[in-house]
Amino acid sequence: MIDRLIHYDPVRTVTTLQVRADNIFADDGHLSVAGINENIAQTCAARMGYISHSSGGRVKIGVIGAITGFSVTRTPLVGEVLTTTIDVIQEVFQVTLVHATVTVGTEVIAETDLKIALQD
């Protein structure tokens, strides 16, 4: 649930998503908290997909092992554009720890840390 992958480097990945009224997670003119979580998860998936595609490998399935410190200051309105930034904190074996920040313009609306395990 992203529109564009706009930046990738080994530490940072950035995506955008315009909230649409027909989004499955949109209700009463807002994207739900679950929708914000899904956007973060899909940004992580886009990162891994891009890495796999660029290296000619197959895409591995990622499983979220933990979400910690999740905070939302507000839910975005239909029509607003989310910018989601994933910063890699640590990668050990098949486990990646990331910090996610979701903004609308310059306003931070959500932050969390995730632990993602890759399956072979």
Where are these regions (language model features)?
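Hydrophobic residues on conserved beta-strands that form the core of alpha/beta folds
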Residues: 2-3, 64-67, 97, 111
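Short amphipathic alpha-helical segments enriched in hydrophobics
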Residues: 9, 23, 44-51
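Catalytic strand-loop segment that frames the active site of acyl-thioester-processing enzymes
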Residues: 1-32
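Hydrophobic beta-strand-centered segment that forms part of the acyl-chain substrate-binding groove
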Residues: 46-83
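HotDog/MaoC-like acyl-thioester-processing domains
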Residues: 14, 77-83, 88-120
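A residue-level detector for short acidic-glycine micro-motifs
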Residues: 4-7, 69, 74, 88-90, ...
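Compact, glycine-rich, soluble single-domain proteins
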Residues: 28-47, 61-65
